[in-house]
C-alpha cells in the first residue's frame, strides 16, 4: 500500500505551513466578502423614484432601506420610527396584506424644481396619502413632516 506524505506532494521549497497560511487568507477574504452589505442603495434620480422607493420599502417592512429615502432630521426620524412601530404593531396577517398591496399613484404635483408632492394610496387601506419629495445632494428624499404635519 502506498502512503502519501506531505513531503512527496509538495515541492521542496514549499512547506505545508505555507499552504495552510494561504488557505487561511483565502477563507478570511471569502468571509469578509460575504459579510459586506449585499443590498445596494439605489439613488433616486427623480421625485417619482424617491417616493416610490420609500413607499415600496416601507410596505415591504424593509425600514432599513426605506430610511435611506427620507430627509434625515430629528422630526423626520421620529415620524419614521412611529411608522415602523405601527407596522410592527400589526399582526402577521396585517403585515402580509400591506406587503401584498399595490401602490396607486393618483397625482404628481411639481411645486418647483426641487419640491414635488405625490398623492397616492395603496390597495390595502385605500386611504389617500401625500408625500413631499425634496431634491437633495444625495437624491430625491421624502419629507415626512409634510405628510404628518399641519401643512395638508
What spans do the regions from the language model cover?
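Exposed beta-sheet edge and beta->alpha loop/turn motif
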Residues: 100-152
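Short, Lys/Arg-enriched N-terminal segments with co-localized hydrophobic residues
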Residues: 8-17
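Transmembrane signal-anchor/signal-peptide helices with a preference for the extracytoplasmic
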Residues: 37-42
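Intrinsic disorder/low-complexity segments
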Residues: 1-2
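Sec-dependent signal peptide recognition
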Residues: 21-28
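C-terminal motif of bacterial Sec signal peptides marking the signal peptidase cleavage site
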Residues: 33-34
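Short solvent-exposed beta->alpha transition segments
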Residues: 43, 48-49, 53, 58-111
